[in-house]
Amino acid sequence: MKYPKQIRTYCPFCKRHTIHKVERVKKRPRSELSAGQRRFRRILKGYGGFPRPKPEGREKPVKKLDLRFRCTVCGKAHTRGRGFRVKKFELVEV
């Protein structure tokens, strides 16, 4: 899917329609020092199996896109609705 690099859309911070730059956000690596991750590592230690049951069903073939729209006037970024599933994604100059 081809998507424009810049679009004119509503900015909730400026409260008006402005030009926005479109950014695709990648998943960052997990923080190994967060409280939840430290607790999880502690549970995994020693004998015994995994602390949670296996998830039901199957893995989805494609992840949802995480698009951020950054306002060129105020510089703040926001999302617009939920992400959508697409195999190929490309930002193009219009």
Swiss-Prot record:
<dbReference type="GO" id="GO:0003735">
    <property type="term" value="F:structural constituent of ribosome"/>
</dbReference>
<comment type="similarity">
    <text>Belongs to the eukaryotic ribosomal protein eL42 family.</text>
</comment>
<keyword id="KW-0694">RNA-binding</keyword>
<comment type="function">
    <text>Binds to the 23S rRNA.</text>
</comment>
<protein>
    <recommendedName>
        <fullName>Large ribosomal subunit protein eL42</fullName>
    </recommendedName>
</protein>
<feature type="binding site">
    <location>
        <position position="71"/>
    </location>
    <ligand>
        <name>Zn(2+)</name>
    </ligand>
</feature>
<keyword id="KW-0689">Ribosomal protein</keyword>
<keyword id="KW-0863">Zinc-finger</keyword>
<dbReference type="GO" id="GO:1990904">
    <property type="term" value="C:ribonucleoprotein complex"/>
</dbReference>
<dbReference type="InterPro" id="IPR000552">
    <property type="entry name" value="Ribosomal_eL44"/>
</dbReference>
<dbReference type="GO" id="GO:0008270">
    <property type="term" value="F:zinc ion binding"/>
</dbReference>
<feature type="binding site">
    <location>
        <position position="11"/>
    </location>
    <ligand>
        <name>Zn(2+)</name>
    </ligand>
</feature>
<dbReference type="GO" id="GO:0006412">
    <property type="term" value="P:translation"/>
</dbReference>
<keyword id="KW-0687">Ribonucleoprotein</keyword>
<feature type="binding site">
    <location>
        <position position="14"/>
    </location>
    <ligand>
        <name>Zn(2+)</name>
    </ligand>
</feature>
<dbReference type="InterPro" id="IPR053708">
    <property type="entry name" value="Ribosomal_LSU_eL42"/>
</dbReference>
<keyword id="KW-0862">Zinc</keyword>
<dbReference type="InterPro" id="IPR011332">
    <property type="entry name" value="Ribosomal_zn-bd"/>
</dbReference>
<feature type="zinc finger region" description="C4-type">
    <location>
        <begin position="11"/>
        <end position="74"/>
    </location>
</feature>
<dbReference type="GO" id="GO:0070180">
    <property type="term" value="F:large ribosomal subunit rRNA binding"/>
</dbReference>
<dbReference type="GO" id="GO:0005840">
    <property type="term" value="C:ribosome"/>
</dbReference>
<dbReference type="Pfam" id="PF00935">
    <property type="entry name" value="Ribosomal_L44"/>
</dbReference>
<keyword id="KW-0699">rRNA-binding</keyword>
<feature type="binding site">
    <location>
        <position position="74"/>
    </location>
    <ligand>
        <name>Zn(2+)</name>
    </ligand>
</feature>
<comment type="subunit">
    <text>Part of the 50S ribosomal subunit.</text>
</comment>
<keyword id="KW-0479">Metal-binding</keyword>
